[in-house]
Amino acid sequence: MDCLIANINENDQFLERLKESESLLNTFYQYDAMSPESFEQALNAPNNGREQELASVISNYMSDLELTEAQQINIDKLKKGAKVVIGGQQAGLFGGPLYTFHKILSIVNLSRQLNEEYNKEVVPVFWIAGEDHDFDEVNHTYVFNTEKAKLHKVKYHTMTPPESNVSRFIPDKDKMLEALDDFLVQIPETAHTNHLRNEVQHIIKNYASWSDMFKALLHIVFKEYGVLLIDAQDPKLRHLEKPILKEMLKKHDEVDRAFRQRQAETVEAGLAEMIQTDTNVHLFLHEDDMRQLLTYEDGHYYTSKSQTAYTLDELLEIVENTPERFSNNVVTRPIMEEWLFNTVSFIGGPSEIKYWAELKAAFDVLDVTMPIVLPRMKITYITKRIEKLLKRYDINAEHVIADGIDNDKNKFIRAHASEQFLNELDQLEAQQKETYERLAAEVQGNEDNKNLVEKNNQIHQSQYDYLRKRYFINIERENAISMKHFRELNETLHPMGGLQERVWNALQFMNEFGTDMFSPSIYPPLRYTLKQIIIKP
């Protein structure tokens, strides 16, 4: 595989400010993410003392997987106090969008670099957001149908979506297999298709919960890198979290005030407001088979749907006896993660690193240190077919990745149009406009005639627009194959108006290049970068 680094204009000014180590922006974080001194400081920070228990919890969570030597070594390193680079994602159907894989690759590569550059043990950890309950965000994925040159939505269909954590959801295996068939039927059969189908079918048949299927897929793909996996909703992890859960309940008012004040400060500094929540407790409680947000009012805590009232002592008793009933919201999840791990750096998506800027004061209330916050690497894949089409039409890949295909498509259509036809049409339109201006001047004193002329002019002008539009449409029809190629380029490099990794699913590339395409022996070695990476398999 070839690997290129591309300079693509960022529409996101936040990332540019981060790259430039803007002092105002850095006030909202613990560390300057661009400073080597920050890494030195984070790597040498004292550990929290929970590493042995945490390593035991992770080992237990991954016990249903066949661990590689690299994973077992990393569990041992974690137990002995190794720092971590961590990131996480919701459990998407068949792994979800490509950026999930790219987050893990970012975590792996930054961990390796820190090992090499600072001679410190750093372990890659991926946090599965199994506590989340928004099933609509994870129940579907997309596959590109080459024959039709369009994206196809593949969805797990259910009449009873879970109202609890995704980790508790047990999907229907037949419906999961149907979704897999729907995915694979859209793409060409290759030498790798049967193996890919068998791998995913094995996962569906041998794992029960939605997030465990997700875990098993990630393990197959990234086990050789030594990546450690943990589900936020793992019961043993919740038991380890009992002390901080109690503090979150006791100090919920301080946490809420600190968060809202810091959020107001970020908005005042010109940043967009990222977190929107009405709760003042920032924790969920599992009750009546539903994940319910807690809110505090008049001395009691109330569940959002059942409206059950609890005292603080009653909730603290639940924490002590069944902590797995609790889960975090967007405000407390990052704090929980960093309370557990000795983290050097958190790797997040663009939105994640923005909303972390609103949380520094909440971290401080609970005496938890915010790690270095960095965005995941952005990676786009250009296959030989796509590269061939780019060369055929003399199109710059970086322009399409950033802005889409419309400019190149319009140039192509214009190049196949008759300049004489268009020039004469323009002249005719201009002549008619002048004629109507003279007619309007002649009837200026009569309002009815003036309106009549204006209306008639509009009708004729719209006919010129229609003629021009239909003329270009007919050119598109005459060049239907090229138009299909342009759609293919756009849906591959700029799908849905954004980056490939936000839409495409990794299984599509694994079908073409092998289920082991992401393994260390095949995937190109990367160094962590904020620039766009282009990989040509």
Swiss-Prot record:
EC numbers, comma separated:
6.-.-.-
UniProt cross-references to InterPro entries, sorted A to Z: Bacillithiol_biosynth_BshC (IPR011199), CC_BshC (IPR055399), Rossmann-like_BshC (IPR055398)
> Which residue spans traverse the membrane?
none
Kindly indicate whether the keyword Ligase belongs to this entry.
Answer: yes
- Pfam families recorded: CC_BshC, Rossmann-like_BshC
Q: Which GO terms describe its molecular function?
A: ligase activity
User: Which positions form S-S bridges?
Assistant: none
Arranged from A to Z, the UniProt key words for this protein are:
Coiled coil, Ligase
Q: Which residues form a coiled coil?
A: 417-457
Query: What is the similarity comment for this entry?
Result: Belongs to the BshC family.
What does the UniProt function comment say about this protein?
Answer: Involved in bacillithiol (BSH) biosynthesis. May catalyze the last step of the pathway, the addition of cysteine to glucosamine malate (GlcN-Mal) to generate BSH.
Q: What is this protein called?
A: Putative cysteine ligase BshC
Q: Please tell me the species this chain comes from.
A: Staphylococcus carnosus (strain TM300)
